Amino acid sequence: MIQQETYLNVADNSGAKKLRVIRVIGGFHKKYGTVGDIVVCSVREAIPNSDVKKGDVVRAVIVRTKKEIRRNDGTYIRFDDNAAVLIDKFNAPRGTRIFGPVARELREKGFMKIVSLAPEVW
């Protein structure tokens, strides 16, 4: 359950380290985001000399949440942190590597490039 003002870790090598959510995209007054949702964020921490600077407004897709996700077969999955991957306006990842596992729900939402770069898909 990612909402406005939530801090997210960045799970790629785009140069950002921490993001703060400004808005969850989709629907009218959508309050909460989960795995596969696109969010507009502000970069709160960044690596020096990187493409992304502190204060930049970026789009990201949520790849991990601490709040469990119920799947159609009745199982639940949750992760140790809230994490996102920075994307461009074509929904392609801005980084070239993904760190840590990502949820299988990303495949159903059409983020195949992120799924293929990830070391593990749960």
Curated annotation (Swiss-Prot):
One of its GO terms (molecular function) is structural constituent of ribosome. Keywords: Ribonucleoprotein, Ribosomal protein, RNA-binding, rRNA-binding. It comes from the Bacteria. One of its GO terms (cellular component) is cytosolic large ribosomal subunit. PROSITE patterns: RIBOSOMAL_L14 (PS00049). InterPro entries: Ribosomal_uL14, Ribosomal_uL14_bac-type, Ribosomal_uL14_CS, Ribosomal_uL14_sf. The keyword Cell cycle does not apply. Disulfide bonds: none annotated. GO terms for biological process: translation. The keyword Signal does not apply. Part of the 50S ribosomal subunit. Forms a cluster with proteins L3 and L19. In the 70S ribosome, L14 and L19 interact and together make contacts with the 16S rRNA in bridges B5 and B8. Belongs to the universal ribosomal protein uL14 family. Binds to 23S rRNA. Forms part of two intersubunit bridges in the 70S ribosome. This is Large ribosomal subunit protein uL14. The gene is rplN.
